[in-house]
Swiss-Prot record:
Entries under PROSITE patterns matching the protein: ER_TARGET
Molecular-function annotations in GO: UDP-glucose:glycoprotein glucosyltransferase activity; unfolded protein binding
UniProt protein name: UDP-glucose:glycoprotein glucosyltransferase 1
GO biological process: protein glycosylation
Coiled coil location: none
Reaction equation(s) it catalyzes: N(4)-(alpha-D-Man-(1->2)-alpha-D-Man-(1->2)-alpha-D-Man-(1->3)-[alpha-D-Man-(1->2)-alpha-D-Man-(1->3)-[alpha-D-Man-(1->2)-alpha-D-Man-(1->6)]-alpha-D-Man-(1->6)]-beta-D-Man-(1->4)-beta-D-GlcNAc-(1->4)-beta-D-GlcNAc)-L-asparaginyl-[protein] (N-glucan mannose isomer 9A1,2,3B1,2,3) + UDP-alpha-D-glucose = N(4)-(alpha-D-Glc-(1->3)-alpha-D-Man-(1->2)-alpha-D-Man-(1->2)-alpha-D-Man-(1->3)-[alpha-D-Man-(1->2)-alpha-D-Man-(1->3)-[alpha-D-Man-(1->2)-alpha-D-Man-(1->6)]-alpha-D-Man-(1->6)]-beta-D-Man-(1->4)-beta-D-GlcNAc-(1->4)-beta-D-GlcNAc)-L-asparaginyl-[protein] + UDP + H(+)
Origin species: Mus musculus
Cell compartment(s), UniProt: Endoplasmic reticulum lumen; Endoplasmic reticulum-Golgi intermediate compartment
Signal peptide range: 1-42
Length: 1551
């Protein structure tokens, strides 16, 4: 007789023989089938999940164009040209042939790796959001009637090219449009000309016609041509998304919470769940392979597979001793497979763990595996901070955070890395050398640069080390290490803190700065203070005519005759005479001097013969030389303060902060022995690496632009025709090929080797060397280069006049010398050429040969100089125009590929700037790259070139975290290893994972997709936990991700990627959850089934869950610049120019966080009209898409990644003392929120003017059909017991499509209002993973931001409650100043005493005799709640407690009870909530509400309890059911009035 045991034995044996697939399967199946048919049969059940966008799918051609645009606009325009006739997929036989045509066109511009990334990107539909954003921007224009394509000229639209001419004539009268980063701008020859935006669909004939006409206009300089995608007739298909996870969690059935209402299944396309998996392994049998080998046995194979599935799907619980080693055993099972198959096994086990666990307990674990894992774990902890069981992923050493990084960010990382690796590969750097160079940390440091303050130009007021006023202070630096209270400023007799005021005495702010200096001195702040007076330094000007010179001479006189301190006192007396709003005058100085020094002739101090003029010239020289920017400037230890920090109120505070900050720096230096007592402290400060001779904001700016120097070719600038046909990268390569360099020890070129020195710094000097400014720049560069052996320089000429022999003599001479002369001769000759007198002499007709230098071959030089070929100059000019985007004659310095400029006409860029540039390059990148290049053993000239090219490539990368080194992890026994293909660029990918964690469920499928996408050296290290005491994974999981678009058998696009749970066990109760990227808000839109309670035994075949991406979130952080604190209660609105207020939100005090719901498009962020807008103004914004000075803050949402902005606000001058929350309701009396008050009396929204005090606001949450059934009954019980208007607020996140469809109908029948509110759990707040706990979190954590400010008070009523009284009474209940009121737990039912956990332990001591309150019913005074920042306090406490998995077991209840000391609770009278579990029967008759609490003693199902406890419950239930039947009938007959209900859910959503 057959038994399940026999089947399992047979399966196990077969699994061992899995490689012998060609055994006679007919025999095996013939043996197995009798067993199979003797077992109970059951249909295979499945659950599928899909996620689509709200917007329609765009042609893949458009998305491919955006992929290329990310690489360069050049590639975009070339691709557009190449695809003019592709059209849409309608023009092709099949979708597949259209797809192939798009790929073929794109592949011409892409490397093989980039080709794979394009396929992946099209599968992800990454750029569909970009196309939709353009579509929304086009709709906002709006498009003219009946136009497939249209043009917009400065806000005027047309689709008629004839009308374009007239619009161009008047364009200058209208403002230019705001252009966005993602716009496609055609290269323009005249940036000043009008902007013409073409909205059209590429690949179509109509586009092609207009496009070519616009190109010709652009080339003529008549227009600036910008292209934006626009589809006049979009497809009706939505976009199927991927890059998310679907979890099927097993629910506890301790309390039965499943609705008994029967639902009708829907028709589902059977191909959706076809067994298409090529491997399809069950218990060792590879059914995909078997179907291929034995097609005739397909029916029997199907039955046999079904039997094996059912026999493995039993989920009997495991004993504790069986759980202990599960993590190691799973690792052993995974590592037993070879190569990529081990990833397949990891994916299969982790994603189906509940049914795999029993079999895994039989796996043996080798001692080597265990020992290696434990050894590696020491390294994991020490180097990357991982504990056993933690997971991590690194790509080329970059940490990919699995919790916060979504697949779209990961794709960006892959793409950026591909660019760098391919760049290095093109430069001939491969394999290990490539990865060593890639991991160099060469990002420019964020250091604040300082200038040297050891200058005679500074007049020091005091000196802490010698002045007698500081004699009582200790002088030892060891004092720094003595403990003090935080914030105490140490008074030590050392010049540790030096403050220099660089001022123009007659500037209006000077008086304020001097009074701050006086405050520091009089309060004995340990600051050495100095002044630099920047005054007119002309010798003709004296102090009797010029107030600035008068102040300087008066100060110098007193300093010389007495001392600096007295000189400063004189200075303050002078400025005390200056009235507010005025500036200092000569008479102010004269009157003070006459009063203080009556015996001295004032004219002798201030007049023409004054002897007190020292450091007047030096002061101006120092100011100009250091380049510190416009006056006034204040330096702290040489570092300039920001302009906004010079505000008198700010400066004092910031200086104190700086003193404390630098004290920490000195403490460390003293502790480490770097700074000792006998050292000069100022010398020590000035020898720090951040001290530079000159601060040039051009050089130090964070925004940096680099040339792409990675192309290689054999072209040169001396063939202009060939040069002009190259693309930007090709032109740059030709320029680099043609360069000859000047160096200190001579010139290295292709022919001449004077030395074998690698020079890590390369300057290309760009300018018109036939003009004085270009020559000056070259001269300064040569002067600097003579002092440094690290530098080589060469030149690119950017002529300012028409090119001819007569307009270019000097550059032609320079070029001829570089081509023909030995290095030292060329350098000396070019130095002469850079001098002004040479240019003057040449212009006067002197022969060029007159300027020859010793050792020069004059005849060879003259031969080249006089040759008529001008190709090299034409090539240089074209390069400056097309690649460097310069106007004629503009100057630029290119240092290791970094473009600095264009410089302004009169802008100084001198020897010190070159010194600073060299300094920075050597420190950040030059030396590190040089040492690696030296190891490659290439010749010197090539090596210097390589340093330059590698530096440009690496420095151009976006700044990120440092790469992590992980070479020392052992991988013999405990790691999956996949070697890369030889000879190709590869990614170095390292994963650390515990195979029985949620991270493994995501990581395994991700790595499997990556193996198909990219060439990689992959190591996956096992990081197992030992001694498990609980089942580590209690859910099934699918990660939706495909490496390429798939097609059906007839070559049509397959119905997007979906999650499939096939062959699921049928006995458990499941709940379905989606894990989506942080910024996505999704909702369930179609399924008749209860996704919170999926019970497959009651399902016919398939549960198909359809979700929709409802919103993309715009998130932000907001701060008040005056206080540095978030402006609590500030409101923002988000809208478009046509509809300014679509959504709004409130700023939290936690991190100043806010979130707004949006979708792809251009959005305008504003302060909300009312108090927010009255009190505040937006001061600055970061991460947005509009210029900093623009009135509107524009934000573009054009991808699926998170968009996080920073907004700084400032109170308006006349509102400085206003409190935002003091009267926060006025702004809500009308306007936006009123438009949401939506009654059902047929009135328009704006006519419904309810008095907000005469409405009962009731908030509730529900998930699953049973609780939604309870919720409808609760609502009915509320409505039956009150005459006051009611508005229900429901948390939208977890409501089923069925509920959302029915609620508008119910609202209309019973005449109540409702709104669906929504908030995405912020990423920075500790996440809950279990659905029930997430819902509990929403009940308490976001009350201040979930509701608009119009809501002053609301009641929370649990879904499973029955109300028996008028809730108006509770709404009007006096909370005695508390922000909320809760009912305490009953303690009258004595038999439940053993279950009252709050009566003992932690809760008993914390409550100290107070009541423990139940969260089923509460009332919140939102005005008070916000005023005392209750929401922020609750979130803060939650963040601390929730890290411990054992705390907050009843989150929504434990948190407010835990916070009673910080956020007081008003206890409501007991009769407000009666619950049979805790309250005795006698008190039931007084009950105002009855709650169907769970009973831990009886575990009675909710439905049974409801019928037994509440007599009226069944009547309510029947009434609702009748209404649902009516609704269904009307829906099927088509008589349902859907005008209101269709929009219901949208109309009522709010944040």
């Amino acid at each position: 007789m057959c038994s399940r045991g026999d089947a399992n034995t047979a399966d196990a044996a077969a699994a061992r023989r899995v490689t012998g697939l060609r055994y006679n399967m007919r025999l095996l199946i013939a043996l197995a089938l009798p067993c199979l048919f003797s077992l109970a049969e059951a249909n295979s059940k499945a659950i599928t999940t899909s996620l689509t966008t709200k917007w329609f799918s765009a042609p893949l051609l458009l998305e491919a164009s955006e992929f290329l645009a990310e690489d360069s606009q050049e590639k975009f325009w070339s691709f557009v040209e190449a695809t003019q006739n592709i059209g849409s997929s309608d023009h092709h036989d099949t979708d597949h042939s259209y797809y192939d045509a798009v790929l073929e066109a794109a592949f011409r511009f892409l490397s093989p790796l980039q080709q794979n990334l394009l396929k992946f990107c099209l599968s992800l539909r990454s750029y569909s959001a970009s196309i939709q954003a353009f579509q929304q921007i086009a709709v906002d224009e709006p498009p003219p009637e009946g136009c497939k394509s249209f043009l917009s000229v400065h806000g005027k639209q047309t689709c008629d090219l004839d009308t374009l001419e007239s619009l161009l004539l008047t364009a200058a009268d209208r403002p230019k449009p705001l252009l966005f980063k993602g716009d496609h701008r055609y290269p323009s020859s005249n940036p000043e000309s009008p902007v013409v935006i073409l909205y059209s669909e590429i690949g179509h004939e109509e586009f092609s016609n207009i496009h070519h006409q616009l190109i010709s206009k652009s080339n003529e300089g008549k227009i600036n041509y910008v292209f934006r995608h626009y589809i006049s007739n979009p497809s009706k298909e939505p976009v199927y998304l991927s890059g998310y996870g679907v979890e099927l969690a097993i629910k506890s059935t301790e309390y039965k919470a499943k609705d008994d209402t029967q639902v009708k299944g829907t028709e589902v396309n059977a191909t959706v769940i076809g067994e298409s998996d090529p491997i399809d392994e069950v218990q060792g049998f590879l059914f995909g392979k078997l179907r291929e080998l034995y097609p005739a046995l397909e029916g029997q194979l199907k039955e046999f597979r079904k039997h094996l599935v059912e026999s493995t799907n039993e989920m009997a619980p495991l004993k504790v001793w069986q759980l202990q080693d599960l993590s190691f055993q799973t690792a052993a099972r995974i590592l037993a497979a070879s190569g990529a198959l081990s990833l397949v096994v990891m994916k299969d086990i982790s994603q189906n763990f509940p049914t795999k666990a029993r079999a895994i307990t039989k796996t043996a674990v080798s001692a080597q595996l265990r020992a290696e894992v434990e050894e590696n774990q020491k390294y994991f902890k020490g180097t990357i901070g991982l504990q056993p069981g933690d997971s991590a992923l690194f790509i080329n050493g970059l940490h990919i955070d699995l919790d916060t990084q979504d697949i779209f960010s990961l794709f960006d990382t892959l793409r950026n890395e591909a660019r760098v690796m391919e760049g290095l590969h093109r430069l001939g750097i491969e394999g290990l050398s490539l990865h060593n160079i890639l991991k160099l940390n060469i990002q420019p440091s964020e250091t604040d640069y300082a200038v040297d303050i050891r200058s005679p130009a500074i007049s020091w007021v005091n000196n802490l080390e010698v002045d007698s006023r500081y004699n009582s202070w200790p002088s030892s630096l060891q004092e720094l290490l003595r403990p003090t209270f935080p914030g105490v400023i140490r008074q030590i007799r050392k010049n540790l803190h030096n403050m220099v005021f660089i001022i123009d005495p007659v500037h209006e702010t000077t008086a304020e700065l001097i009074s701050i200096a006086e405050m520091f001195l009089s309060n004995h702040i340990p600051l050495r203070i100095g002044f630099i007076f920047v005054v007119n330094d002309s010798e003709d000007v004296d102090g009797m005519q010029d107030a600035g010179v008068a102040v300087l001479r008066a100060y110098n006189y007193v300093a010389q005759e007495v001392d600096g301190y007295h000189a400063f006192q004189t200075l303050t007396q002078i400025y005390n005479k200056v009235r507010t709003g005025e500036t200092v005058k000569v008479e102010h100085v004269v009157s003070v001097l006459e009063k203080k020094y009556p015996y001295v002739e004032v004219n002798s101090i201030l007049g023409i013969d004054s002897a007190y003029d020292q450091n007047r010239k030096e002061a101006r020289g120092y100011y100009e030389q250091t380049g510190v920017g416009p006056l006034p400037v204040v330096l702290f230890n040489g570092m300039p303060f920001e302009k906004e920090q010079l505000d008198p109120d700010e400066l004092e505070t910031i200086t104190m902060h700086k003193i404390l900050e630098t004290t920490t720096f000195f403490q460390r230096a003293v502790y480490l022995g770097e700074l000792s007592h006998d050292q000069d402290v100022v010398e020590y400060i000035m020898n720090q690496p951040n001290v530079v001779p000159r601060i040039n904001s051009r050089i130090l700016t964070a925004k940096r632009e680099y040339l792409d120097l990675t192309a290689s070719n054999n072209f040169y600038v001396d063939d202009f025709a060939r040069f002009s046909a190259l693309d930007s990268r090709g032109k740059t390569a030709a320029i680099a090929n043609s360069m000859n360099y000047l160096t200190k020890k001579g010139m290295s070129s292709k022919e001449i080797y004077d030395d074998s020195f690698i020079r890590p710094v390369t300057f290309w000097i760009v300018g018109d060397f036939d003009s004085p400014s270009g020559r000056q720049l070259l001269y300064d560069a040569i002067k600097h280069q003579k002092t440094s052996n690290n530098v080589r320089i060469s030149m690119i000429n950017n002529p300012s006049q028409e090119i001819s022999d007569s307009s270019t003599p000097i550059f032609r001479a320079i070029w001829a010398a570089l081509q023909t002369q030995a290095s030292s001769s060329a350098k000396n000759f070019i130095t002469k050429m850079a001098k002004e007198e040479t240019a003057e002499a040449l212009a006067a007709g002197v022969d060029i040969a007159e300027f020859s230098v010793g050792g020069m071959d004059v005849s060879l030089f003259k031969e080249v100089f006089e040759s008529s070929r001008m190709d090299f100059i034409l090539s240089h000019a074209l390069y400056c125009r097309d690649v460097l985007k310069l106007k004629k004659g503009q100057r630029v310095v290119i240092s290791n590929g970094r473009i600095i400029g264009p410089l302004e006409d009169n802008e100084l860029f001198n020897q010190d700037d070159f010194h600073l540039l060299e300094n920075i390059i050597l420190k950040t990148s030059g030396q590190k790259i040089k040492s690696h290049i030296q190891q490659l053993r290439v010749e010197e000239d090539v090596a210097s070139d390589l340093v330059m090219k590698v530096d440009a490539l690496l420095s151009a990368q976006p700044k990120g975290e440092a790469r992590i080194e992980y070479q020392f992890f052992e991988d013999k026994h405990s790691a999956i290893k996949l070697k890369p293909k030889e000879g190709e660029t590869y990614y170095d990918v390292v994963a650390v994972v515990d195979p029985v964690t949620r991270e493994a469920q995501r990581l395994a499928p991700l790595l499997l997709v990556l193996t198909q996408l990219i060439n990689m050296n992959l190591r996956v290290f096992m990081n197992c936990q030992s001694k498990l005491s609980d089942m580590p994974l209690k859910s099934f999981y699918r990660y939706v991700l495909e490496p390429e678009i798939s097609f059906t058998a007839d070559s049509s696009f397959a119905k997007g990627p979906i999650a499939k749970f096939l062959d699921m066990p049928q006995s458990p109760l499941f709940t379905l959850n989606l894990n989506t990227p942080e910024s996505w808000m999704v909702e369930s839109v179609r399924t008749p089934y209860d996704l919170d309670n999926i019970y497959l035994e009651e399902v016919d075949s398939i549960v198909a869950a359809e979700y929709e991406l409802e919103y993309l979130l715009l998130e932000g952080h907001c701060y008040d610049i005056t206080t540095g604190q978030p402006p609590r209660g500030l409101q923002f609105t988000l809208g478009t120019s046509a509809n300014p207020t679509i959504v709004d939100t409130i700023v939290m005090a936690n991190l100043g966080y806010f979130q707004l719901k949006a979708n792809p498009g251009a959005w305008i962020l504003r302060l909300r009209k009312g108090r927010s807008d009255d009190i505040y103004r937006i001061y600055s914004h970061d991460g947005t898409d509009s210029p900093p000075d623009a009135n509107d803050v524009v934000v573009i949402l054009n991808n699926f990644k998170s968009k996080i902005i920073k907004v700084k606000v400032q109170k308006k001058a006349d509102m400085a003392n206003e409190d935002l929350l003091s009267d926060g309701t006025n702004e809500n009396e009308s306007g936006f929120w009123d438009s949401f008050k939506w009654g059902f009396s047929g009135q328009k929204a704006e006519e419904v003017k309810q008095d907000k005090d005469d409405i009962i606001n009731i908030f509730s949450v529900a998930s699953g059909h049973l609780y939604e059934r309870f919720l409808r009954i609760m609502m009915l019980s509320v409505l039956k017991n009150t005459k006051t208007p009611v508005k229900f607020w429901f948390l939208k996140n977890y409501l089923s499509p069925t509920f959302k469809e029915f609620i508008p109908y119910m609202a209309k029948k019973y005449n109540f209002q409702y709104e669906l509110v929504q908030y995405k759990w912020p990423r920075w707040l500790h996440q809950q993973t279990e659905k029930q706990r997430i819902i509990w979190g929403y009940k308490i954590l976001f009350l201040d931001v979930l509701f608009p400010l119009v809501v002053d008070k609301f009641l929370f009523v649990d879904a499973d409650q029955i109300v028996r009284t008028d809730l108006k009474e509770l709404r009007d209940f006096n909370l005695d100043g508390a922000p909320y009121g809760y009912t305490p737990f009953c303690d009258s039912r004595r038999e439940m005493d053993g279950y009252r956990f709050w009566k003992s332990g932690y809760w008993a001591s914390h409550l100290a005799g107070r009541k423990y309150h139940i969260s089923a019913l509460y009332v919140v005074d939102l005005k008070k709640f916000r005023k005392i920042a209750a929401g922020d306090r609750l979130r803060g406490q939650y963040q601390g407690l929730s890290q411990d998995p054992n705390s907050l077991s009843n989150l929504d209840q434990d948190l407010p009870n835990n916070m009673i000391h910080q956020v007081p609770i008003k206890s409501l009278p007991q009769e407000w909530l009666w619950c049979e579990t805790w309250c005795d029967d006698a008190s039931k008759k007084r009950a105002k509400t009855i709650d169907l609490c769970n009973n831990p003693m009886t575990k009675e199902p909710k439905l049974e309890a409801a019928v037994r406890i509440v007599p009226e419950w069944q009547d309510y239930d029947q009434e609702i059911k009748q209404l649902q039947t009516l609704f269904q009938e009307e829906k099927e007959l088509g008589t349902l009035h859907t005008e209101e209900t269709q929009e219901g859910s949208q109309k009522h959503e709010e944040l």
